Amino acid sequence: MANTVQHRLRDWLLSLYQHLLPQRTLSQLMYRLTRHRIVWLTGLQIRLFARIFGVNLKEAEFSSPKDYPHFNAFFTRALGKEARPIADSADAVVSPVDGCISQLGSLTDDRLLQAKGWSYNLVELLGGSKSRAAPFRGGQFATLYLSPKDYHRIHMPLAGHLREMTYLPGRLFSVSPKTVNGIHNLFARNERVVNVFDTEAGPLAMVLVGAIFVGSIETVWAGQITPPYRHQPHHQLYEGEKAISLAKGQEMGRFNMGSTVILIFPPDTIHWQSELQAEMPVRMGQPLGQLITAVQTEVEKQWANA
């Protein structure tokens, strides 16, 4: 307990400066720095970044720095077709990203765990709409952190039909582990895009959380959502001619720098893999869990064969 308090105080002190930073100005600057087309500088940026962060360019669709017109094209690079196989079980819920597990588990009293001893409110995270949050009360969640070195495209954990997308303005605090442990209610305060899909597990919320230096957030159906940075929420329904359907493992969006994805499922729909825990690395396409119906069917088979 004492160590937890000491670490929380340390991380809070280390995060204080972020309250004073011109977060949007710095993020806009990063947007420009990663999209210039000065060939020699782009090549230098890519080589230095790959060396410092240990990026494996061999698994990318294009492996040479010369193949990228600007740094952001490299940062959001596509991978080779065989680099991230999608778990072949029809009942598997797969990781939508490369990254690491920040937290994973059940919602308690409509709250999601942010860090040990800290939680935040489901309704606030989803934009203040009680009706939007209602199906997820008592459900399951997984928070996945993408560091700068990770592959930055976001994919579908299940096949789904997009129901709605909501942009929510907010701060742009870092989402690094130390900041998550040092700034209370961070994910419900930061800029984010809430996407709700209809899936075979019921509704699925995928929350794309912005952060400082995240030059922009994109989805495959709406394109670049930020910038420009807005001061008011923006809500869009996708019905009729606007209907969007995506397969499991299909790309749904991307971060143009590192950030966080939060998955939220209704109660009694998903069983997480037992070995998963906080700080564990994951790769896009690997199974995170299994649909409850599939778990129940397997148990019934075991009893029948006993």
Swiss-Prot record:
EC number: 4.1.1.65
One GO term (biological process): phosphatidylethanolamine biosynthetic process
Entry-annotated residues carrying Pyruvic acid (Ser): S259
Enzyme class: lyase
Cofactor or coenzyme needed: pyruvate
Post-translational modification: Is synthesized initially as an inactive proenzyme. Formation of the active enzyme involves a self-maturation process in which the active site pyruvoyl group is generated from an internal serine residue via an autocatalytic post-translational modification. Two non-identical subunits are generated from the proenzyme in this reaction, and the pyruvate is formed at the N-terminus of the alpha chain, which is derived from the carboxyl end of the proenzyme.
Record keywords, A-Z: Cell membrane, Decarboxylase, Lipid biosynthesis, Lipid metabolism, Lyase, Membrane, Phospholipid biosynthesis, Phospholipid metabolism, Pyruvate, Zymogen
Residues annotated as site: Cleavage (non-hydrolytic): G258, S259
Catalytic activity: a 1,2-diacyl-sn-glycero-3-phospho-L-serine + H(+) = a 1,2-diacyl-sn-glycero-3-phosphoethanolamine + CO2
Functional pathway: Phospholipid metabolism; phosphatidylethanolamine biosynthesis; phosphatidylethanolamine from CDP-diacylglycerol: step 2/2
Cofactor: record remark: Binds 1 pyruvoyl group covalently per subunit.
Compartment(s) of residence: Cell membrane
Family: Belongs to the phosphatidylserine decarboxylase family. PSD-B subfamily. Prokaryotic type I sub-subfamily.
Record-given protein name: Phosphatidylserine decarboxylase proenzyme
Source organism of the structure: Nitrosococcus oceani (strain ATCC 19707 / BCRC 17464 / JCM 30415 / NCIMB 11848 / C-107)
Organism ancestry: Bacteria, Pseudomonadati, Pseudomonadota, Gammaproteobacteria, Chromatiales
